[in-house]
Amino acid sequence: MDGLPGRALGAACLLLLAAGWLGPEAWGSPTPPPTPAAPPPPPPPGSPGGSQDTCTSCGGFRRPEELGRVDGDFLEAVKRHILSRLQMRGRPNITHAVPKAAMVTALRKLHAGKVREDGRVEIPHLDGHASPGADGQERVSEIISFAETDGLASSRVRLYFFISNEGNQNLFVVQASLWLYLKLLPYVLEKGSRRKVRVKVYFQEQGHGDRWNMVEKRVDLKRSGWHTFPLTEAIQALFERGERRLNLDVQCDSCQELAVVPVFVDPGEESHRPFVVVQARLGDSRHRIRKRGLECDGRTNLCCRQQFFIDFRLIGWNDWIIAPTGYYGNYCEGSCPAYLAGVPGSASSFHTAVVNQYRMRGLNPGTVNSCCIPTKLSTMSMLYFDDEYNIVKRDVPNMIVEECGCA
């Protein structure tokens, strides 16, 4: 994982970053990196939070005035951290936006989202805070992909979707569905009767590019509306083949006779563009920490959690991150007296690994003092565009610092 430039971290803290446990927003430090908005004042010289000697194992950490453009460096480190957690090499190149009508329709169907007066999408639980109930549960990634069309394939309509597997080669598809809008045109029916049609969705069989399987559904229609068709098997086969393009052929029996129109890719019907939703399970380790840490309130110099918020609009990322609007990049700061050392939990084990590395290098571990570092990290839900203009809803683990401790 990327962190601050090498000049800003000592060997011990670099080891913690390499372990994938400490994020750039969560550095243990005697002096915290300043924040973009309302940064806390630097600790006075000689205070527990202001001395470099307080945390010898992070001895490479420099005071803000020694780093020059620390604000820019810090924001770049946060950007790299977010991209790393999303398993992306760089931010997506958004050259043309998905039609907002199509996006909003999909989000409303799946997340009960709404559009604010300023045009931004607001979705419950995607506010930059930790995801409720996410820790200790299975991680599930959700991908929304909108249809494109190759035109007609005999009597069927060919749709295709580019579906990203989120950088994970071993995703297990929990559920996947095609959402298709069926529109009713004026038609004379007997009172109380409905229009009954049969929709067939064809997808390529695994291992046989020239053979197609079919999902069939009989639909009784009283009004225009959305209908779903299961595609779990098709998407799982796609991932197992290592492919990204999903080809679907759609056929509707009796639609023409009964004045039923499946809406495909029509510039005049963007809010009804077909889309595929994939829910896939992510295997990720879970951390359970027992001890609750202090909040920085300006009245203590002991190890505590400092909160701050980064608005994605201010760093130019609001074009590809739909929700949340920003990131709570909390970090740890403060002194670690001897009586606070050895907080139980993952932090202790990582600190032990660092000390062992010092021993291997012939250094005296007795000179390595405790560092104020994260002891609990939580999950954050994000909704964003990937390079293929899929809308991805993902619960990203270890994103937000919840508690700090000494180790």
Swiss-Prot record:
Main location: secreted
Biased composition (Pro residues): 30-47
Pfam name, any one: TGFb_propeptide
InterPro entries listed in its UniProt record: Cystine-knot_cytokine (IPR029034), INHBB_C (IPR000381), TGF-b_C (IPR001839), TGF-b_propeptide (IPR001111), TGF-beta-rel (IPR015615), TGFb_CS (IPR017948)
Disulfide bonds: C296-C304, C303-C372, C332-C404, C336-C406
GO cellular component term, pick one: cell periphery
Stretches of the chain forming a coiled coil according to its record: none
Keyword Hydrolase part of the UniProt annotation: no
Keyword Transmembrane helix: no
Residues carrying a glycan: N93
Propeptide: 29-292
GO biological process: one example: cell differentiation
Compartment list: Secreted
Region (Disordered): 26-62
UniProt GO MF annotations: cytokine activity; growth factor activity; hormone activity; host cell surface receptor binding; protein homodimerization activity
SUPFAM superfamilies per the UniProt record, alphabetical: Cystine-knot cytokines
Keyword annotations from UniProtKB, A to Z: Cleavage on pair of basic residues, Disulfide bond, Glycoprotein, Growth factor, Hormone, Secreted, Signal
Signal sequence, renumbered to the chain: 1-28
Family, as annotated: Belongs to the TGF-beta family.
Known role: Inhibins and activins inhibit and activate, respectively, the secretion of follitropin by the pituitary gland. Inhibins/activins are involved in regulating a number of diverse functions such as hypothalamic and pituitary hormone secretion, gonadal hormone secretion, germ cell development and maturation, erythroid differentiation, insulin secretion, nerve cell survival, embryonic axial development or bone growth, depending on their subunit composition. Inhibins appear to oppose the functions of activins. Activin B is a dimer of alpha and beta-B that plays a role in several essential biological processes including embryonic development, stem cell maintenance and differentiation, haematopoiesis, cell proliferation and wound healing. Signals through type I receptor ACVR1C, abundantly expressed in pancreatic beta cells, and type II receptors like ACVR2A or BMPR2. Upon ligand binding, these receptors phosphorylate intracellular signaling mediators SMAD2 and SMAD3, which form a complex with SMAD4, translocate to the nucleus, and regulate gene expression.
Quaternary structure annotation from Swiss-Prot or TrEMBL: Dimeric, linked by one or more disulfide bonds. Inhibin B is a dimer of alpha and beta-B. Activin B is a homodimer of beta-B. Activin AB is a dimer of beta-A and beta-B. Interacts with FST and FSTL3. Activin B interacts with BMPR2.
Protein name: Inhibin beta B chain
Organism phylogeny: Eukaryota, Metazoa, Chordata, Craniata, Vertebrata
